[in-house]
């Protein structure tokens, strides 16, 4: 394979390896793009006050963003099997930049909801890169390279909270979304220069492509199992972050967006663990890694309830719930992609669609739980999601 400085001119072939510079670019852009979903989380209290809405309405901002991402997974990501990834990525980044500017300028929560929904749809680029890392890597490097790209993605998830917390506290929440639009334009220029040619793996019409996704879902029960199990684990993690700004705004913390953002650094443990987890999957198997992930999340919610008024308790909760979620995501996602090696984007679509439906439900349930029982309600909601995920593992044993 040509591994010179230019990667735009090469053509990737399955199982033949990915140039290191391209792999780094995929990880970096994955993180910067997926960050669009999470900038709003530390800023919810600031947005709520600025737009004069209640906590449930503010929580819906995160919810519709997650729903948009799920829709993008279902209708945009599969196109990577039949169209140019470079063109899909470019269109998505331009749209994401426009929606970020719209969010920064609006004074109506309804417009913010709509723009957040579309922003979620346009932020699915990482989910074209993760299966790409598996499909084109050398067989012995597939799990490792997937973990590398996921580490970049997860660093973006957690780094987004840190950056938005600081920018929101110092310059206001609207500034964060202007910055996000600039980041997307930079990613656009880089991706147009570096993304290589890749031959389509599907020949046919879009309707046939969508039907093939349904066929894969019907014919592969393990894909259904892995997807649903990971979805509940992700929902459990989203319960933490969807209400963190509200929890820290009250007694005894009285903290602003900067403090919420700083807690994002604690979740970096999950991002750092992702690459290592990928190495253990072939050795210990998907079920064992998932089991460990569920146990970590159960412990996390016990800590969250017992030490609700302690920063140390909150930090421990974030670390445990994030690492638990990454155990589930990487192991179950790897299992899904292994079921259909020639249709990785479509099987990844199924997996990630479930994941973000689970995340959306976790966000929604946590929002209503907060409105009813405050932090105790959030802990109960997160615990239920973790218990369901563990129950699936114990019953199915795969």
Pin down the residues of each PLM region.
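Helix-to-loop junctions at the C-terminal end of transmembrane segments
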Residues: 73-84, 273-286, 370
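Intracellular juxtamembrane helix-capping segments at the cytosolic ends
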Residues: 125-137, 327-340
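Helix-loop-helix hairpin linking two adjacent transmembrane segments in secondary transporters
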Residues: 148-195
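Helix-breaking motifs and short loop linkers at transmembrane-helix boundaries and internal kinks
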Residues: 52, 84, 105-110, 307-308
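Conserved MFS/SLC helix-loop-helix module at the cytosolic interface between two early adjacent transmembrane helices
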Residues: 71-107
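Cytoplasmic helix-loop-helix junction between adjacent transmembrane helices
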Residues: 115-151
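Juxtamembrane intracellular "pre-TM" segments in multi-pass secondary transporters
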Residues: 7-17, 195-228
């Amino acid at each position: 394979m040509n591994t010179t400085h230019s990667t735009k001119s090469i053509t990737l072939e399955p199982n033949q390896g990915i140039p290191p510079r391209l792999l780094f670019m995929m990880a970096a852009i994955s993180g910067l793009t997926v960050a669009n979903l999470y900038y709003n989380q530390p800023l919810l209290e600031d947005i709520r006050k600025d737009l004069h809405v209640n906590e449930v309405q503010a929580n819906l901002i995160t919810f519709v963003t997650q729903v948009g991402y799920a829709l993008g997974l279902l209708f945009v990501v599969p196109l990577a099997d039949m169209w140019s990834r470079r063109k899909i990525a470019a269109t998505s980044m331009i749209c994401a930049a426009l929606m970020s500017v719209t969010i920064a300028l609006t004074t109506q929560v309804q417009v913010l909801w709509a723009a957040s929904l579309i922003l979620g749809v346009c932020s699915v680029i990482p989910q074209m890169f993760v299966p790409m890392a598996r499909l084109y890597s050398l067989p012995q490097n597939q799990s490792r390279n997937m973990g590398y790209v996921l580490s970049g993605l997860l660093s973006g998830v957690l780094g987004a909270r840190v950056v938005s917390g600081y920018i929101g506290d110092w310059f206001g929440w609207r500034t964060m979304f202007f910055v996000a639009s600039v980041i997307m334009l930079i990613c656009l220029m880089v991706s147009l220069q570096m993304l290589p040619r890749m031959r389509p793996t599907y020949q046919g019409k879009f309707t046939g492509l969508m039907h093939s996704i349904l066929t894969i879902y019907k014919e592969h029960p393990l894909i259904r199992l892995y997807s649903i199990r990971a979805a509940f684990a992700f929902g459990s993690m989203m319960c933490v972050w969807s209400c963190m700004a509200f929890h820290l705004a009250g007694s005894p913390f009285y903290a602003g967006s900067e403090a919420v953002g700083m807690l994002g650094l604690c979740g970096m443990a999950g991002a750092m663990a992702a690459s290592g987890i990928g190495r253990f999957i072939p050795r210990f198997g998907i079920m064992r890694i998932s089991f460990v992930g569920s146990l970590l999340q159960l412990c996390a919610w016990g800590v969250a309830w017992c030490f609700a008024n302690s920063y140390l308790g909150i930090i421990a909760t974030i670390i445990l719930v994030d690492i638990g979620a990454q155990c589930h995501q990487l192991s179950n996602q790897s299992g899904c992609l292994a079921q259909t090696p020639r249709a990785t984007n479509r099987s990844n679509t199924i997996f990630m669609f479930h994941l973000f439906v689970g995340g959306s439900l976790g966000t929604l349930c946590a929002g209503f739980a907060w409105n009813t029982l405050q932090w105790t309600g959030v802990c109960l909601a997160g615990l239920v999601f973790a218990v369901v995920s563990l129950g699936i593992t114990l019953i199915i044993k795969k």
